[in-house]
Amino acid sequence: MSQQVIIFDTTLRDGEQALQASLSAKEKLQIALALERMGVDVMEVGFPVSSPGDFESVQTIARTIKNSRVCALARCVEKDIDVAAQALKVADAFRIHTFIATSPMHIATKLRSTLDEVIERAVYMVKRARNYTDDVEFSCEDAGRTPVDDLARVVEAAINAGARTINIPDTVGYTMPFEFAGIISGLYERVPNIDKAIISVHTHDDLGIAVGNSLAAVHAGARQVEGAMNGIGERAGNCALEEVIMAIKVRKDIMNVHTNINHHEIWRTSQTVSQICNMPIPANKAIVGSGAFAHSSGIHQDGVLKNRENYEIMTPESIGLNQIQLNLTSRSGRAAVKHRMEEMGYKDTDYNMDHLYDAFLKLADKKGQVFDYDLEALAFINKQQEEPEHFRLDYFSVQSGSSDIATASVKLACGEEIKAEAANGNGPVDAIYQAINRITGYDVELVKYDLNAKGQGKDALGQVDIVVNHHGRRFHGVGLATDIVESSAKAMMHVLNNIWRAAEVEKELQRKAQNKENNKETV
C-alpha cells in the first residue's frame, strides 16, 4: 500500500516574495480558498511578525479555512513565535513553522554563532512553539550546504524538543538530485528518533531542478513536499507543486506514493494564482502552460488522433482543463449562466451572481456569443472588484489621431461626489491616467503595464494588469473589457481603490493601537 506525501503550499508566503506588488488580504484569501478546494494539506500563509498587514491577512485566512491546516512562519525568535501564535489562534488547529540556519557559512557569517549555540536556540524555540500547538515544523535553513553529520545533530535535537515535521530546504537551489536524495537517506541512517517526525523538503529552482530534487527526496523517504503553484517564488522560484503532484500521479508505478490532492482543480488554481499575482504562465510551462497539451508536428497529430496515449502521458481533463464550449448568448438566462458556472466547477460563493450576470449581458451584447474563458475572466474580475468602491468610473471619452498627443475627458464618482477633468497625454491611455490622477490627487507612478487577450478573435476580451508606485508601496490593479482603453481605465480605478482601502486599513489599525494604549493607561 502506498504512503501519502503531504503537500505543503507556500504560495502565499515564499511565493509572494516574487511579486512586484504585495497582495491585499482579500486577494490572499481568494488564493487560500482555491488551494483549499484543490486539497492542499498545509498552507503557509504569511510571516505575521513582519507587518500589521501580514498579521491581519494570516488571521483572516486562519479564521476562514477549515479543510487545510493553516501555517505561519517564524524565525527562532521569541517574538516571532508569539506573534505567529496570536495570529493563528482563531483557527481550530494550526501549525507554527520556525527556522534557523545550519550551514557553516550561514552560522559563521550571518548568525556569527556556533553549531552548538544554534542547536540550543532551535531546541528552546521549538519548545516555545509547542506551548501553543502540538503541530510544530522546524526548518534547517541552507540544509543543502550543511554537512550531513551536523544536520543529523540538529534534526535529532529538534525532534526531541517536540518538532513533528523536519524540513530540509535546498535554500539556494544548489544541490543535485542525487546529492539531495543522499542527504535524506543520510538522515534516516544517522538520526535515531527520525521515525517520530515527518521529513519534508523545500527546494528552489536556481539551477532548474527544484522539482527533480523534491521527487528524488520523496524516493529517498521524504513524506512532505513544500512548493508554490506555478513555481512562483524568490529568485528563480520554488518547486512547482502542480508538477510534483502530477509526476507522483503519472509515475505511481515507480514512486509508490500518493497525494490527496484533487488534481481536477489544478488548472483552475493555477489560473487563479496567475491572475491575482499578475504573473503570466509561460506557454511551455509543464502541466499548466497553454502549450502543454498542444501538438503541432504532423507525425504527433496523426499519432494523437489514432490514440492519445501515443503522445500524451496525461489528459487535459485530468487537471481540470476541459474543451471550450460556445453555448451562451445575450438570450441566455441567469439559470443557464449559473448552470454553466457549476459545470466548470464554480460554487455560489466563488462569485456574485448579480454582478456576473450584469457583466455577462453587457459582454454578450457586444460579442454575440460568450465562451467559457469569457465567463471565467468575468467571474475573476468581479470577485476582485466586488468590495465597496470609493472611486467609480462614470464616463470617459478620448480624442486621438495621427499625432502622439491625445485628449481625455473623465468623470468619476468619488464617494458621494461626482468630479470631472480633462487632460492631454502621450496616447489615449496616458491621457486617461493623467485625467484620473487630476481628479483623485493621488501621486502614482506607473511601473508596469501588461495587456493580455482573454479568448480568441477580434472580439476577445483585453485584460490590463498594471503596477503603480505610491509613496514607496506598490499596488496592483486589473481591468477587463473588449476595448483596451476601457480596460486600462478600469485597471487604474482598481489600483486607486486598493490604495484607498489600504489607507483605510492603516487608519483602523492605528485606531486599534491607540485604543489599546488608552486602555493600558486607564488600567
UniProtKB/Swiss-Prot annotation:
Residues 5-267 form the Pyruvate carboxyltransferase domain. It comes from the Bacteria. GO terms for cellular component: cytosol. GO terms for biological process: L-leucine biosynthetic process. CDD domains: DRE_TIM_IPMS. Its EC number is 2.3.3.13. GO terms for molecular function: 2-isopropylmalate synthase activity; acetyl-CoA C-acetyltransferase activity; manganese ion binding. It is found in: Cytoplasm. It catalyses: 3-methyl-2-oxobutanoate + acetyl-CoA + H2O = (2S)-2-isopropylmalate + CoA + H(+). Its cofactor is Mn(2+). Pathway: Amino-acid biosynthesis; L-leucine biosynthesis; L-leucine from 3-methyl-2-oxobutanoate: step 1/4. Mn(2+) binds at residues 14, 202, 204, 238. Residues 392-523 are annotated as: Regulatory domain. Keywords: Amino-acid biosynthesis, Branched-chain amino acid biosynthesis, Cytoplasm, Leucine biosynthesis, Manganese, Metal-binding, Transferase. Homodimer. Belongs to the alpha-IPM synthase/homocitrate synthase family. LeuA type 1 subfamily. Catalyzes the condensation of the acetyl group of acetyl-CoA with 3-methyl-2-oxobutanoate (2-ketoisovalerate) to form 3-carboxy-3-hydroxy-4-methylpentanoate (2-isopropylmalate). This is 2-isopropylmalate synthase. The gene is leuA.
